[in-house]
Swiss-Prot record:
The modification Phosphothreonine is found at residue 215. This is RUN domain-containing protein 3A. PROSITE patterns: RUN. Belongs to the RUNDC3 family. Residues 216-239, 372-404 are annotated as: Disordered. May act as an effector of RAP2A in neuronal cells.
Amino acid sequence: METSFVQTTMALGLSSKKASSRNVAVERKNLITVCRFSVKTLLEKYTAEPIDDSSEEFVNFAAILEQILSHRFKACAPAGPVSWFSSDGQRGFWDYIRLACSKVPNNCVSSIENMENISTARAKGRAWIRVALMEKRMSEYITTALRDTRTTRRFYDSGAIMLRDEATILTGMLIGLSAIDFSFCLKGEVLDGKTPVVIDYTPYLKFTQSYDYLTDEEERHSAESSTSEDNSPEHPYLPLVTDEDSWYSKWHKMEQKFRIVYAQKGYLEELVRLRESQLKDLEAENRRLQLQLEEAAAQNQREKRELEGVILELQEQLTGLIPSDHAPLAQGSKELTTPLVNQWPSLGTLNGAEGASNSKLYRRHSFMSTEPLSAEASLSSDSQRLGEGTRDEEPWGPIGKDPTPSMLGLCGSLASIPSCKSLASFKSNECLVSDSPEGSPALSPS
């Protein structure tokens, strides 16, 4: 018993779900069909004059579009069931538009948010519909919103038009509205959000009478009765319009279609001219940026060469400031450019002193290092040659041969190793010189 009851309940639930999904599908189809009729009516009505709020066709179209955007909206859904043509609970689609259309470049969302006379979400949604139509960007807004599938699923329940393929059909229909000029005043009772949205279906209802139910006898009876003088009613199956009227109506429809296509052609041409001007501006900007890039590259090359020259100059200056290992040798060679013999006192001066027996202590010049002197200093032996012989009565002097063996190191060149002693033997700082006439003065290291 319980099993059968559960099965019955499940069957009823499945049937109710199927009925609900079928009703939702019917709602989608009806709304899209009515929207197609409304757009077609607007295109047929449009002439050179812009369409405003006084147009019944626009009022009906705005109501239909608001119903489509509010179809199965989650935000303010009431607790009880709501019919698909009702607007009591279908509110708040502006919250979805505000988030989903914020990525549209140069959008009107912020300007609508800052309007002082519009406070409710419904009023802002209606204002957005009018502004988007005046901007001729309604299809662009809807397309951008549909791309944000995450936000769309967040605001709409399953089965909504914005989540089905009918949304793509809607964007295709809204493209044709770009050829129409709209002019609206964003003030008044229409935008206060309190007036309910009502769709008028009478312009889209078409009554077509069928004559299939008439039998042959009835047709003959009607034909016979039409010949009588007393009874001459107009038969319902007879054509009410002549061929001329039918041709005129066809011509009128073709003219309207031509005007619509011509208006769309003008809009597309204007759009192409706008895109061409934008392309030219972008090309000019690209050329200007390319020139700036080339100038910057040339300037960078010049600065690089200048910096390389500065680096080389600084390296030369740094090389001149760093002391080399042979600097003491060069300084020593400069000090010893004069012969070393001239640095010693003359022997004649010693002979002319107060007494011959008095010995004097002479200090030799001290050198910081004898090894550099032995390597770099040179004495000209040819210019300081002494004479071959000397007399006992003549004082010792630079002229003549010096018989003193200890003074041989001062003759000749220090650079010639075979002809002189090494200066390494002169490491002592003092030597005694005796000017006694008995013998040659001797130098002995102390």
